[in-house]
Amino acid sequence: MESDEAAAVSPQATTPSGGTGASGPKKRGRKPKTKEDSQTPSSQQQSDVKMKESGKKTQQSPSVDEKYSQWKGLVPILYDWLANHNLVWPSLSCRWGPQLEQATYKNRQRLYLSEQTDGSVPNTLVIANCEVVKPRVAAAEHISQFNEEARSPFVKKYKTIIHPGEVNRIRELPQNSKIVATHTDSPDVLIWDVETQPNRHAVLGAANSRPDLILTGHQDNAEFALAMCPTEPFVLSGGKDKSVVLWSIQDHITTIGTDSKSSGSIIKQTGEGTDKNESPTVGPRGVYHGHEDTVEDVAFSPTSAQEFCSVGDDSCLILWDARTGTNPVTKVEKAHDADLHCVDWNPHDDNLILTGSADNTVRLFDRRKLTANGVGSPIYKFEGHKAAVLCVQWSPDKSSVFGSSAEDGLLNIWDYDRVSKKSDRAAKSPAGLFFQHAGHRDKVVDFHWNASDPWTIVSVSDDCETTGGGGTLQIWRMSDLIYRPEEEVVAELEKFKSHVMTCASKP
């Protein structure tokens, strides 16, 4: 039974004093820090102190707070809707779950996130209910009136799962988004049926929740690279053992029917307990070798469970086909000039693959233009970030649109179709970039397009550098005047032309 009276995510009652989360750089994230460490000045603060001590009048770029204030002032103009939710503990991943209810002015939907703690309370996988306001419903003057330190009334905790270790990645099964996979600092992938898992109280000393399945096969920690197949119940993972591992969980899911609301659940085993070791295990369907360093991300083809790709710290992009064996089909040796962090396969066009890297760029590859030995350049390089790119994802709403988030605190929205369109005006922004979400004040570690609600995105930032800890979750939708065809927008604005002109003529 869902309840809107449930406690909001990250209740203050279970957090340490000061509400700080974690620190110390971790690959694409970080480890929680001690309370003493939370008092250490951030790099921005240290830089400001050095500037004051030097006494030099050097022209500085706007500070994080100044940029944020500028952005917040533009929220009523740029956004159709925005909800800001303070996280006392940071979350390294965020994902949309199934839509629960549709109403006149808003929809209710599951949201998956996590709490990465310092050990004073357990690490958790959080299942929340989110109220998603429908387009053109929220008043412009209201969406920018939020307190950065407050929890959003649109996000309510529904259930807590005590996770064995911190949650680095969450991925939902497309055929049944009530089933999710998680990565932690271990070789295993954990599978959870979030609807049947009991709600737990996260207090120090509480036993871990018991995963419904454990996928084994890695020989070293597999921390981030994780994907679930859009066509079949297959799971893909990559890790420090330089391998890509494929599993099928078909035999462990009961299929009740074709209705998405009752599409199946994890087959339950007899016996009770919360010990992870009591959970049933599933061995790999295949183990694939070809990387020379840690595999950082993986993605399935949108049309086949047998085809997938991976990227890693060896700067390689590798395409695989399980039907041809365990060796790479195509290996792009120098896909970027640094470590690759993320990859996504276009769900509308299975020839297009996006990659993001520590070289601050996003690159677009067309697999038809790659030879078997990896010879072939990206068809475009998107340059708009000033720090390492952490996440890329194609939009479910338009085949040429995608998002990228980075350590510079920005979430950029791009349209590849706009790259080729020439403009008489001098380019003031990178080619293809048409929207920049600047609502986060620190690295944006993950985001997810909402397939049930067009142009709606959830994003999370890890705020250790700017606020000393914790994180920020934002749910937002840009104004449709930004992405709709120009002729449609002009026609709509013409209706208000006389009113605008009248207002402009007044003293």
UniProtKB/Swiss-Prot annotation:
Induction: Induced by dehydroabietinal-dependent (DA), a diterpenoid tricyclic diterpene that promotes flowering and systemic acquired resistance (SAR). The modification N-acetylmethionine is found at M1. A motif (DWD box) lies at residues 308-323. Expressed in rosette leaves, cauline leaves, main stems and developing fruits. Expressed at higher levels in roots and flowers. GO terms for biological process: cell differentiation; DNA repair; epigenetic regulation of gene expression; flower development; gene silencing by siRNA-directed DNA methylation; regulation of DNA-templated transcription; regulation of photoperiodism, flowering; regulation of timing of transition from vegetative to reproductive phase. One of its GO terms (molecular function) is metal ion binding. WD repeats lie at residues 95-137, 162-202, 217-257, 290-330, 335-375, 384-424, 439-486. Its main location: nucleus. Keywords: Acetylation, Chromatin regulator, Developmental protein, Differentiation, Flowering, Nucleus, Repeat, Repressor, Transcription, Transcription regulation, WD repeat. Residues 258-272 have a biased composition (Polar residues). It is found in: Nucleus. Gene3D superfamilies: YVTN repeat-like/Quinoprotein amine dehydrogenase (2.130.10.10). Disruption phenotype: Reduced H3K27me3 level but increased levels of histone H3 acetylation and H3K4me3 on FLC in the fve msi5 double mutant. Delayed flowering. Impaired systemic acquired resistance (SAR) toward pathogenic bacteria (e.g. Pseudomonas syringae pv tomato DC3000 (avrPto)). Lost ability of dehydroabietinal-dependent (DA, a diterpenoid tricyclic diterpene) to trigger flowering and systemic acquired resistance (SAR). Residues 1-66, 258-282 are annotated as: Disordered. The keyword Heme does not apply. GO terms for cellular component: Cul4-RING E3 ubiquitin ligase complex; cytoplasm; cytosol; ESC/E(Z) complex; histone deacetylase complex; mitochondrion; nucleolus; nucleus. Binds zinc. Interacts with AHL16 and HOS1. Interacts with LHP1, PDP1, PDP2 and PDP3. Component of the PRC2 (polycomb repressive complex 2) complex which regulates histone methylation on histone H3K27. The DWD box is required for interaction with DDB1A. Belongs to the WD repeat RBAP46/RBAP48/MSI1 family. Core histone-binding subunit that may target chromatin assembly factors, chromatin remodeling factors and histone deacetylases to their histone substrates in a manner that is regulated by nucleosomal DNA. Component of the flowering autonomous pathway which positively regulates flowering by promoting transcriptional repression of the flowering repressor FLC. May promote histone deacetylation at the FLC locus leading to the formation of repressive chromatin structures. Forms a histone deacetylase complex with HDA5, HDA6 and FLD that represses FLC gene expression to control flowering time. This is WD-40 repeat-containing protein MSI4. It comes from Arabidopsis thaliana (Mouse-ear cress). The gene is MSI4.
